[in-house]
Amino acid sequence: MDLEAKVKKMGLGHEQGFGAPCLKCKEKCEGFELHFWRKICRNCKCGQEEHDVLLSNEEDRKVGKLFEDTKYTTLIAKLKSDGIPMYKRNVMILTNPVAAKKNVSINTVTYEWAPPVQNQALARQYMQMLPKEKQPVAGSEGAQYRKKQLAKQLPAHDQDPSKCHELSPKEVKEMEQFVKKYKNEALGVGDVKLPRDMNTQGPNKMYIPGGDRSTTTAVGAMEDKSAEHKRTQYSCYCCKLSMKEGDPAIYAERAGYDKLWHPACFVCSTCHELLVDMIYFWKNGKLYCGRHYCDSEKPRCAGCDELIFSNEYTQAENQNWHLKHFCCFDCDNILAGEIYVMVNDKPVCKPCYVKNHAEVCQGCHNAIDPEVQRVTYNNFSWHASTECFLCSCCSKCLIGQKFMPVEGMVFCSVECKKMMS
């Protein structure tokens, strides 16, 4: 790709969703404007998924690329125009007759995603077993939840080098090898079935859930098992509770069909969120979302949110950073060798801290320098000096003394408090 095409592509990426309102900050945000290398809005610091941006096509491309060159190609289709793989997301529309006084109206419910099973009743049953606030009904809280989890769990920059910021040719090659490896060894999609339907494993054979994976027995030998025994032999791999007969379960092929999960228990072992669209990564007996699987394999830059493929990076405040991305969260100035303050787990340079985040002294009404001692009570702060931490009535210095706080004032005695009341 030549330089002009690269610049054009980057420009289009930054134009996507430009000006969209923030659903979290409301009117405090002037509208979405993508930061040059951080994956956040320059105005409010929230992610794109927190803004009212239509991303369905972009997300379908992202998931389509994830499934490319895997056994899950049946879940994608390539556009004739550009050959880009698109996720064939299964949308489920349910129509329920609603009786009115004079006639019958039709109530339609659209799920933006549903398990790709032929039995719609099974898919509907699966949805009903999810928390209502996480059911992806179009226009609902659940649809917004799914949108956020697609962005959080499956970052495009964890699989596509073109979505990353200034990778070297060596880093691009390493990333491509990493993606190929996790597609071959960890990536999977959950399968929704009734546990009893998973018994058949080959002609005249029945699989025993919970036993050795190679254990089989003749069908005839199982026919005398009681219904009660069949119910108790199935338990959720996550919560360990028994599965109710007739309820759908989720299987993960990479985990083996001796393990199954309740729909609401099919979650990432790190963030404990529902695995979006049942897309999972399996490692050492645990389910992960894409983000946290990658975090278990590679360091992630706390500045740009990308995986680090360089041998040289810095560690600070229990986080990892590209050398060029250990910058002030407010002004983007590089912090190497500079004084900084952590604000909400983000490093901020001293000038920006004093300007934007510092507490204001109730005595002199100036910002309190981060390196200066202070006195704090509730939400009020003072310089710990003889000029600032004084009785609000008689100006007696209160450092090391007992005091009586009243909102933003402090008093040395009851008498002084009464005189000011």
Curated annotation (Swiss-Prot):
Keyword rRNA-binding included in the entry's annotation: no
Intrachain S-S bonds: none
Ranges of residues in domain LIM zinc-binding: 234-297, 299-359, 362-421
Coiled-coil spans in chain: none
InterPro entries: LIM1_Testin, LIM2_Testin, LIM3_Testin, PET_domain, PET_testin, Pk/Esn/Tes, Znf_LIM
Domain (PET): residue spans on this chain: 92-199
Compositional bias annotation for Basic and acidic residues: 155-164
Family annotation (Pfam families): LIM, PET
Binding partners and assembly: Interacts via LIM domain 1 with ZYX. Interacts (via LIM domain 3) with ENAH and VASP. Interacts with ALKBH4, talin, actin, alpha-actinin, GRIP1 and PXN. Interacts (via LIM domain 2) with ACTL7A (via N-terminus). Heterodimer with ACTL7A; the heterodimer interacts with ENAH to form a heterotrimer.
Official protein name in the record: Testin
Organism: Bos taurus
